[in-house]
Amino acid sequence: QNVKQGIAERARSHAAEGLDQRSNPYRELPRAESDARAAAGEPFAVRLKVPREGQTRFEDIVYGTQERNYSEIEDLVLLRSDGHPLYNLSVVLDDIEMAITHVIRGQDHLTNTHKQILIYEALGAAVPQFAHLPLILAPNKGKLSKRKHGEVVSLTTYRDRGFVPAAFRNFLALLGWSPDDDQEILPLRELAEKFSLAGIGRANAVFNFTENDPRHWTDDKALWMNAEYIRTMPPAELVPMVKAELRAAKLWREEYEEDERAWFERAVELIRHRFFTLKDFSSQGRAYFSDDFDFDETAVSKNLSKEPRLQEWLPELATRLEAVDPFDAASVEVAVRQFADELQVKAGLFINASRTMLTGQAVGPSMFEVFELLGRERSVLRLRSGVPWFASTSLSHPVKTG
């Protein structure tokens, strides 16, 4: 209590003299008195005695010249009264011990840098180069934090939601930095070749997302980039990732590794172009790997319900396709278009209806390629499976096939 009273009295005295209230109350305490009081067991802290005149100055690689007057810097505490070092001393000693030449960190540490330079100089150590990076902010321009923003800032979230590691790394690299040629898709090797601190901007990046919105749960640019990687990465890299996703969803068959490997790789190649995450292979792409799949209600409404005559026409189309030989994309296309011409309707009616019946979706790859991939037996069965529920007025329960 006496120590606190003494500090308060000295602070009031300094304030009366026009000194900064942050000034060290013991700054002018004679060394002999300080040593005697410490030897007598009085608690004490160790401070850095900052010069009153002059300034610290350094060239930040990103933010340029940084200056601060000594009068704006308090006599910072280096060691607490319990002997524990504070942050600024700890990081300086750590960097000296590891012979760090470049300190690269967030721009919220710019203020600390002036204090740390004083410690380097007091210890007679070489001052490293500093590069302070712009921050990544939330949509409201506040700092991102796990406490406030939860899963959206957790790497495991992106792993569990089907992000390709290389894609997410690429996305993060472009938050605050860009290459000279504005290229956006940058595999690791190219990132390493093109990256330079000179390419880092000074403006903070904003991580755009909408909380509690399943469509915009993360930044749209991150999803776009993930889709680009899924569409363009070498099959040898993508196929094992899809295998892991299907295995987790209990859709993997060992035949895909053996007799049906060529079919599996072809399926991945055909359907990957509209997917945004690896999860899409087991959700939107489920119909390719299982006969137990859901129908998208929008797809049913758009492609089936508007034309009640499809209840009769689709089984007839199935009968036509049973006779198609060979059962490939070109032959199926001829059969579908001929059938549409005979009924004097547009072929698109059957193309769209077939897509929903065979995959449960409203959009997807070339429908005739889908017919060929799924094969005659599954295609015919699925075209006929809609009859029992075509007249249903409710889709409150997922429609299954098989």
What is the predicted function of each stretch?
Residues N2-H132, L137-K146, S154, P179:
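Active-site cores that bind ATP or allylic diphosphates and position pyrophosphate for catalysis
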Residues L48, A222, S354:
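Conserved S/T- and glycine-rich ATP-binding loop of Class I adenylate-forming
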Residues M98-V103, V153, L317, A335-R337, ...:
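Glycine- and acidic
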Residues H102-G106, T157, N303, R320:
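Short histidine-centered catalytic/ligand-binding loop motif
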Residues L118, A122, N170-L174, S354:
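Residue-level signal for well-ordered alpha-helical scaffold segments within enzymatic catalytic domains
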Residues A126-F295, T359-H397:
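Catalytic adenosine-cofactor/nucleotide-binding cores of aminoacyl-tRNA synthetases and other
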Residues V239, S305-L358:
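C-terminal accessory/binding modules appended to enzymatic or scaffolding proteins
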